[in-house]
Amino acid sequence: MSLKKVLTSAGAVATALTLVFAGTTPATAAKVPSKKAKAGDECARAGLSAKGRGAEGTDLRCMTMTTGTASGQLRWWYPDLKPLKNIDWVVPANPGGYSQTSTAISESLKKEGLLSTYTSTFKPGAGGTVGLGFFQEIKAKPESVLITGLAMAGGIPSNKSPLKLEASTPIAKVMREYQALAVPATSKYKTLAQFLADWKANPKLAISGGSLGSTDHQFIGLLAKAAGIDPKAMNFVVHSGGPEVIASLLSSATVAGTSGSAEFQAQLAAGKIRVLAVSSAKRLPGYSAKTLKEQNVDLVYGNWRGVMATADLAEADRLNMVKVFDAMRGTDTWKGYLKQYNWDDEWSAGKEFGSFLKVQLPLVAGVIKDLGLGG
């Protein structure tokens, strides 16, 4: 399967966000009937049941919320849900996109009364496989979770690692994020067309991104192919996180760089970088840059991130954790983070996330092969 076909498929676009970052849901929000209910939706009368509408076919009940931003309101909820006391994150990279996501999850859970405390352990290196290996050695710690995503899915075959992501326990795929292609504000490149013309003439232009096989690498490989450049011939300069990519741009160590769009927001607002294109189907709020498609590059691409628990997690604890994360999805705090970071609400919980991984991981392995890695 071709690089373009695989990544275009992998980057299918979720419904555009129209969510409002606010402390409470507007009073005019419609009550959701039981046959359409999701955890966190408003409901009409306490005690009503929504059979099979929860994660993995579990039931929801219309309940008066006692904590969080919806306190005092009627919401579809899990009657047997137990808030988590602690989450101990393993973050398989330096601070950047992964930790941004894990922090957004943790702060959402805390504010909504679903979590008491959380900690993070950073284990960067080898496309996320250092962190994955560390995580998969953890035993008898039900509070331990791993933040993962497309970067790790690519990092495993890129580094010829024997580790298998699916050996851990899938909890939830929580979002999809789009890429931005950026240059320093002082760059001569004002448009994507100018940059692509020079890149085609000189494929060795230094372009910064994440680790080998990462989301950034996959995206730049696809962009190269669209520009008529052999992805195996490009000069992709690896870094362990978004801040390092930004530093390489600001120091002119690289000509251009890519990362998740949220990574560049602060530097863009400060006027230190210029974004030439974003990889979403529609323009992103806060970015004046056009999409790739608007600039005659037929590419829509997005990175997903998700949460894994340890392989030995007891079934009762697994199902409760799945419910906690699924409940978080419907909260105003989490919806606010989706809006703030331009993330798409692309969600799958528990066994559904496991089914996604069974399809996704072989596809990503094919992408890595097209990049000349992992052979």
Q: What residues fall within each predicted segment?
A:
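Periplasmic-binding protein-like
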Residues: 201-202, 326-343, 368-369
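Ligand-binding pocket segment of bilobal, Venus flytrap-like solute-binding proteins
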Residues: 208-289
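C-terminal region of N-terminal signal peptides and the immediate post-cleavage residues
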Residues: 18-36
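A structural signal for short loop-to-beta-strand junctions that line the ligand-binding cleft
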Residues: 143-146, 162-180, 206-208, 293-298
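C-terminal lobe and pocket-closing loops
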Residues: 263-331, 359-363, 367
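N-terminal (or domain-start) structured segment
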Residues: 78-166, 212, 216, 228-256, ...
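Beta->alpha turn/N-cap motifs
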Residues: 146-152, 158, 241-242, 258-264, ...
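Flexible hinge/capping segments at coil-to-helix
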Residues: 183-203, 316
